[in-house]
């Protein structure tokens, strides 16, 4: 039985307003206006054409806007839908079929046939439970079920799951930082040279932005690190315990979060001071280095200083230099320059060298152009074309013959016409000229008469042919118009 237009439009509009029904089941295009009444799914125009090509025995396509619907078809659309079809395929081993582009394989499979049987049973139950096809309780229950599924199943929405995971992770980090802020640990490290203990205090990690460390503690740490031997401070674990104080946590592979108390200003000052230190040398250090250099040149193996020289209030360790160390320093400098060049430093010098090479090559090309031979321009400048034999003076080319021909042609510069005998310098036969000039008039007239006779015969033939064509044309016209 066919439903009215108002009933079908009201029901289909409500069904198409659901989230999963707003996209095509096959390709995901938005706002589908076609549907497969066999499977209760919504399709776009292109996918509906593919379903129509499969045949009505597999999928029967109807328009949700223009076509008329039966109550049985509307029941299938009520209990079906894109979400129900997709979930059924996933639960019954049809995930690969959902991703397949072969519609005939997808909708002729065993899973699709089982889904058709399921739709038929659901349609019968729906008709028994809701006799009125426009019963809104069915739609409200459907909306409530879909909303509950959205709230419980977090894996369906990838982006919401990602946001929730990140929020949870940030909360855990805040808890860790709060626990760490409540406790602080200090570790005593003894220096290698002196018995004075150096206290390395671990700063508190707070949730608020990190504060810059005090200048006094920084100065103290620098002085202790310079005066003492190389001693590595022991960092306490992020969660110190009473039983294992100062024990290091097992290292883990992966990405580690940087500490929040990094002071980049201190790093910059240290780099600038290290760069400016070689440029500003005290007189004592300069004299000491000059003395060491002279001793190295004389072949002294080692130079030891008994007293340490104080530079800018900092103790300087004894300097030990030898000839081998000087050579190694020079080799290290050369290797360093090569490494810097390989990394890209010094590109301007390479560019200048390339420009110098290009300029030298251009000068060489210009010099070659100046020294190029001018034989072709001197000998063949006025000619339009030349041959290879003529250019190289070989084969059948004879320069003397060519010069003679040029002279012969120059003698006929003002002549309007020339003969072959006059060109090659042969004497003309006077008898032939006399006979041609003294021919009798009768022979001349005879030639004219013969020529005229032939022309007259040709004219007669042409006139006869024209008359025949004209008569044929007149007969055809008379036969066509009956006159």
From Swiss-Prot:
Residue ranges, compositional bias (Basic and acidic residues): 169-179, 191-205
Keyword Metal-binding annotated: yes
Pfam families: ArfGap (PF01412)
Compartments reported by the entry: Golgi apparatus
Zinc fingers, C4-type class: 24-47
GO biological process: COPI coating of Golgi vesicle; endoplasmic reticulum to Golgi vesicle-mediated transport; intracellular protein transport; retrograde vesicle-mediated transport, Golgi to endoplasmic reticulum
Ranges annotated as biased composition (Acidic residues): 425-434
Predominant location: Golgi
Keywords: Golgi apparatus, GTPase activation, Metal-binding, Zinc, Zinc-finger
Region spans: Disordered: 169-250, 420-445
Compositional bias of kind Low complexity: 213-243
Domain Arf-GAP: 9-128
Superkingdom of origin organism: Eukaryota
InterPro entries registered for this protein in UniProt: ARFGAP/RecO, ArfGAP_dom, ArfGAP_dom_sf
GO cellular component, one term: endoplasmic reticulum-Golgi intermediate compartment
Transmembrane helix keyword on record: no
GO molecular function, one term: zinc ion binding
Function text: GTPase-activating protein for the ADP ribosylation factor (ARF) family. Involved in retrograde vesicular transport from the Golgi to the endoplasmic reticulum.
Name the record gives this protein: ADP-ribosylation factor GTPase-activating protein glo3
Native organism: Schizosaccharomyces pombe (strain 972 / ATCC 24843) (Fission yeast)
């Amino acid at each position: 039985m066919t439903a009215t237009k108002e009933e079908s439009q009201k029901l289909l509009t409500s069904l198409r307003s659901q989230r999963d029904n707003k996209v095509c089941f096959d390709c995901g295009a938005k706002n589908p206006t076609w549907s497969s009444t066999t499977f209760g799914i919504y399709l776009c125009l292109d996918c509906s054409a593919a379903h129509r090509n499969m045949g009505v025995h597999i999928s029967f396509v109807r328009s949700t806007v223009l076509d008329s619907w039966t109550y049985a078809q509307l029941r299938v659309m009520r209990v079906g839908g894109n979400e129900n079809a997709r979930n059924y395929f996933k639960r019954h081993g049809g995930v690969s079929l959902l991703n397949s582009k072969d519609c005939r394989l997808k909708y002729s499979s065993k899973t699709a046939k089982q889904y058709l049987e399921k739709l038929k049973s659901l349609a019968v139950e729906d008709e028994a439970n809701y006799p009125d096809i426009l019963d809104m309780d069915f739609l409200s229950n459907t909306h409530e079920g879909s909303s509950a599924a959205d709230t419980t199943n977090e894996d369906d929405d990838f982006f919401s799951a990602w946001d929730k995971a990140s929020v949870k992770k940030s909360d855990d980090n805040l808890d860790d930082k709060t626990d760490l802020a409540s406790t602080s640990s200090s570790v005593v490290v003894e220096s290698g040279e002196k018995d004075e203990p150096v206290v390395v205090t671990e700063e508190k990690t707070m949730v608020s932005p990190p504060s810059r460390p005090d200048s006094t503690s920084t100065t103290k740490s620098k002085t202790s690190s310079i005066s003492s031997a190389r001693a590595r401070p022991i960092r306490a674990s992020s969660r110190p315990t009473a039983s294992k104080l100062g024990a290091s946590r097992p290292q883990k592979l992966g990405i580690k979060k940087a500490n929040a108390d990094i002071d980049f200003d201190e790093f910059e000052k240290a780099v600038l001071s290290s760069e400016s230190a070689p440029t500003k040398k005290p007189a004592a250090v300069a004299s000491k280095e000059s003395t060491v250099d002279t001793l190295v040149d004389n072949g002294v193996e080692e130079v030891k200083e008994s007293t340490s020289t104080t530079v800018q209030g900092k103790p300087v360790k004894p300097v030990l230099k030898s000839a081998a160390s000087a050579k190694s320093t020079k080799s290290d400098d050369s290797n360093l320059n090569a490494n810097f060049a390989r990394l890209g430093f010094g590109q301007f010098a390479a560019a200048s060298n390339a420009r110098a090479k290009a300029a030298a090559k251009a000068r060489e090309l210009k010099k070659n152009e100046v020294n190029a031979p001018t034989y072709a321009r001197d000998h063949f400048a006025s000619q339009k074309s030349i041959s290879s034999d003529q250019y190289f003076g070989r084969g059948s080319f004879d320069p003397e013959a060519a010069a003679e021909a040029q002279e012969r042609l120059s003698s006929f510069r003002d002549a309007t016409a020339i003969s072959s005998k006059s060109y090659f310098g042969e004497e003309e036969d006077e008898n032939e000229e006399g006979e041609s000039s003294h021919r009798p008039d009768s022979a001349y007239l005879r030639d004219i008469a013969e020529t005229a006779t032939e022309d007259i015969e040709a004219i007669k033939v042409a006139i006869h042919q024209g008359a025949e064509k004209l008569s044929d044309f007149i007969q055809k016209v008379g036969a066509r118009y009956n006159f």
